[in-house]
Amino acid sequence: MGTWKKINVPADAHDILTVGAVSLDKVNAPFSSIGPTADGRIKPDVMAYGCPTNVVSGRGYIIPDNGTSFACPLIAGMVACLWQACPNKSAKEILDIVRQSGNNCQSPDNIMGYGIPDFWSAYQSATRYNQ
């Protein structure tokens, strides 16, 4: 891995949820890119565990591994559950709810974004006005 850590394509796109990885002590993982984007937007949006993450190896063993590619499915599952619970919400509304449930939402930055989302908090927020 090189020394470049800045967010780039496709993670810097508008209207997407960019997920960074944190270690077990909730610190930005050394391989996880940071913002801002070229036009100054905060990225990553949120963080999830990705260092280490238990995964199934090609041989069927459970092994620890690292990567934002392991953090992203955790958040994708959260988004899918929220959207299933609130099918009338737009993608933008769901993503905003996820961001606002992050433990860093009061002061988002370009290292942790809005922080680690809280599923229960996001669910309560999403369903509060869901008719």
Language model features: what each stretch is:
Residues 121-131:
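Secreted peptidase-domain scaffold signal
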